[in-house]
Amino acid sequence: NEGKKFQVLLGATGTGKTYTIANVIERVNRPTLVLVHNKTLAGQLYSEFQELFPHNRVEYFVSNFDFYQPEAYIPKSDTYIDKNAVMNEEIEMLRTSAINSVLERKDTIIVASVASIYGLTDPDEYRNLVFNIRVGEEINRQELYKKLVDAQYKRNNLDLAPGTFRVRGDVIEIVPASFSDGDVIRIDTFGDEVEKIIQLNPLTGEVKHTYHTFPIFPAYDHASTRERIKEACVTIKAELEERLKFFKENGKLLETERLE
């Protein structure tokens, strides 16, 4: 509030630094990013802030890779090692929930590792994929399915998981990426009109919440519009042709073969 850009807080373990920061967050009342140097500390602070701010949206944003091996080439043995990665779906869901919370609420606190400094989807692109469903409005069902697919949702009429949806008669069920407890959003329609939007447990039938309006956010944090994807494909193809030409002109047949 005094216009200071930086404030250093020193103290040994157990001296109440987290509690002090929590009081600052409460007084400033702004969206907050708490950046730490590893996942272990991030998990610890995430739990502590959840206890200190039970009514705020406290989120967790760390790297979603359980394993990552970048591509490499060993000239001596002419060995090419392809890129390999294993992603953690639960952490991916938490990352998406964190991004959605920033767009939806002003009382968001995100505890993050250094993974948060790397670029994500263009915020404007991400916002363009967000849309609302309202009780009483008329919808074009095919257009709704298209919007869901554009937002990276996958249609699965058998097994519902975060980031999927299914259609059964006049009922559309969607599992937002931020739902981790097995709940679904069920949209009841009569013809093209939305009659009811509820959050329920599909196994017990228990209704958790009734909505008049429900926002649909992208299923993944790296979501882009069709237009941006088409633009990227043109750029990628142009760069491919440029590199192929370079390798051919310099007699690098092996590199040319790999790209082709």
Which residue ranges define each predicted feature?
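ASCE RecA-like P-loop NTPase motor cores
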Residues: 1-260
